[in-house]
Amino acid sequence: YNNRQISEENFMKQMEYLETCNTDWFDILCRNSVSQSHNLSITGGSQKVTYNASFGYSSSHGTQKGDDMTQFNARLNVNAQLLESLSVNFNLSNSFTDRKGYGPGVSPETYAKQTSRAIPFVDENGDRVFYKQYYEYKLNRTGQLEYGYNILNEMENSYSKNKAKNVNMSLNVNWNIVTWLQYQFVGSIAFNLNNSESFAGEKTSYIELNYRGYAYGSESSGSAKFKAALLPFGGELATNETNNTSYN
């Protein structure tokens, strides 16, 4: 308005809209946390052999929309008195955890805490609002640039995943050979696998700010900005896998 780029009437209309906007970011980005857990146990056997098996399932949906976790676990214990002087105990446990979250730089709860309620989520037509911020992209040297940011656009075009698998086995053997001689074996082995993945798609502001320097789809192949972009197409995928085996 000060630069006479919009009329006073339009300026006052926009001011009135912002004053009454009162966007509830927590309602848009957060939810009530819900979790559930189920367990099944089986016990049986005979005079010489007994066993106990259990199976479990749990899931939780965090207070931030898109923060979800699922876990499965199982356990087996077997005790066997093979001879009066020989006993064996075997234990096996296994768990699998799958967690889903957000891509780099995305935190719905932090955004809800720090963002003004005067910023609208959608415009008068119901379309998402991408509010303007400024940055400089070091590779194209075009000075200050403008980009549009919408938190749901970031959430829909980026993600993180983490999967963990754990298997543990142990075996105990006791053998009373004679009254003055006893043999005992204690052994265990554990397998741990962790796989994490983080992705930011080409439509996110994260890619525009760090790798491209212009809005998605705004530059044609061969333009100066297109040539200067570190990543003119696609997004960023980061993976990490840890595999560990231990025994004693």
Regions found by a protein language model. Give the residues of each.
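A generic beta-sheet turn/junction motif
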Residues: 44-48, 57
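C-terminal beta-signal and adjacent terminal beta-strands/loops
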Residues: 27-29
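Residues on the lipid-exposed face of transmembrane beta-strands in outer-membrane beta-barrel proteins
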Residues: 40-44, 74-80, 169-175
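Outer-membrane beta-barrel channels and translocator barrels
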Residues: 35, 46-47, 81-83, 176-178
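Surface-exposed loop/interface segments of Gram-negative outer-membrane beta-barrel transport/assembly proteins
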Residues: 1-22, 32, 62-67, 73, ...
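Transmembrane beta-strand segments that form the barrel wall of outer-membrane beta-barrel proteins
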Residues: 55-61
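Periplasmic plug
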Residues: 52-54, 89
